[in-house]
Amino acid sequence: MTVPATRKDLMIVNMGPHHPSMHGVLRLIVTLDGEDVIDCEPILGYLHRGMEKIAENRTIIQYLPYVTRWDYLATMFTEAITVNAPEELGNIQIPKRASYIRVIMLELSRIASHLLWLGPFMADIGAQTPFFYISRERELLYDLFEAVTGMRMMHNYFRIGGVAADLPHGWIDKCLDFCDYSLTGVAEYQKLITRNPIFLERVEGVGIIGGEEAINWGLSGPMLRASGIQWDLRKVDHYECYDELDWEVQWQKEGDSLARYLVRIGEMTESIKIIQQALEGIPGGPYENLEVRRFDRARDSEWNYFEYRFISKKPSPTFELSKQELYVRVEAPKGELGIFLIGDNSVFPWRWKIRSPGFINLQILPQLVKRMKLADIMTILGSIDIIMGEVDR
């Protein structure tokens, strides 16, 4: 930490790692001159579990339950990126219905993540009521997830070549009802929060990031779009079936905490529009590419002249990851979630590098909080939207 040696009466304060506003186990060492922040040093690693190393000793299917523990509030995105990488390496085709189901699940997960960002963010800056409001919608969302995947969180639903199960009978109608209800809920949030003078006083002009600065820091997601850069990987990379649906990229040009709030609120509305279109246009057909289930190599499967693979239960696919390098990415709620994968003609990846958006977006925090007030740290940190599971991995 760089503290000017000439300054006297500076106070060094630890915020976290068990402060309720730290959104996990983040620790900030803050140097204060009265109420003014002179310096801030984030200390990471309290939730490090060696996720990248674990991946090197697991097949893709064996590794799927682990990835839901990165960003545990938006687990569909970590699953999507985990299956997209081997799909591209193996040139595996996805059935149209599976692609639509994936988009529906991804956007529902985006809404869930933004809801659980909004409640604690408002609580951080002194507004308790919205936290109870978002719990209402979130419970309905988790009921939808539970009906399809069997789990309210940590869904383990995506598979290489499709999804684990089809949508149950009557689920589409329930989801359409949820979309109609959510639109009124988002309008309620805007009426309750957006024009609130106390809220505006806390967020307007706080934590400003310019467009060029955001690009130089490698920011992504709402952090980047709130600074006037219209960059959304759903439009840029054309993955899944997003091109077949009508929706707009949400962005603001002010670059402050209010702009980041407005981008996320707008994204919730756009996600509802995407889900409604996908539900109405979802095609029939298979939900999984069953060709993936075959073994690539049937040799050496005998033991005492007995084919053990025929009596085993639904085996995990053991196709090899070819010897090449690949970077795949999706637009997660917090930004660009990517994986750099190196295959080595083995069932295990040789290298599995995770590019988590929260880790990169967090790097700009010390610069944003300098010369601000102590109370503004909560506002700025909350507007970045971090989950320590994906920051520390």
UniProtKB/Swiss-Prot annotation:
UniProt keyword annotations, A-Z: Chloroplast, Membrane, NAD, NADP, Plastid, Plastoquinone, Quinone, Thylakoid, Translocase, Transport
Superkingdom field: Eukaryota
Subcellular location: Plastid, Chloroplast thylakoid membrane
Chemical reaction(s) catalysed: a plastoquinone + NADH + (n+1) H(+)(in) = a plastoquinol + NAD(+) + n H(+)(out); a plastoquinone + NADPH + (n+1) H(+)(in) = a plastoquinol + NADP(+) + n H(+)(out)
GO-annotated molecular function: NAD binding; oxidoreductase activity, acting on NAD(P)H, quinone or similar compound as acceptor; quinone binding
GO biological process, alphabetically ordered: photosynthesis, light reaction
Signal peptide bounds: none
InterPro entries: NADH_Q_OxRdtase_suD, NADH_UbQ_OxRdtase_49kDa_CS, NDH1_su_D/H, NiFe-Hase_large
GO CC, alphabetical: chloroplast thylakoid membrane
SUPFAM superfamilies for the chain: HydB/Nqo4-like
Record membrane topology: Peripheral membrane protein
EC number(s) from the headed UniProt entry: 7.1.1.-
Pfam families named in the record: Complex1_49kDa
Similarity section: Belongs to the complex I 49 kDa subunit family.
Described function: NDH shuttles electrons from NAD(P)H:plastoquinone, via FMN and iron-sulfur (Fe-S) centers, to quinones in the photosynthetic chain and possibly in a chloroplast respiratory chain. The immediate electron acceptor for the enzyme in this species is believed to be plastoquinone. Couples the redox reaction to proton translocation, and thus conserves the redox energy in a proton gradient.
Subunit comment: NDH is composed of at least 16 different subunits, 5 of which are encoded in the nucleus.
Record's protein name: NAD(P)H-quinone oxidoreductase subunit H, chloroplastic
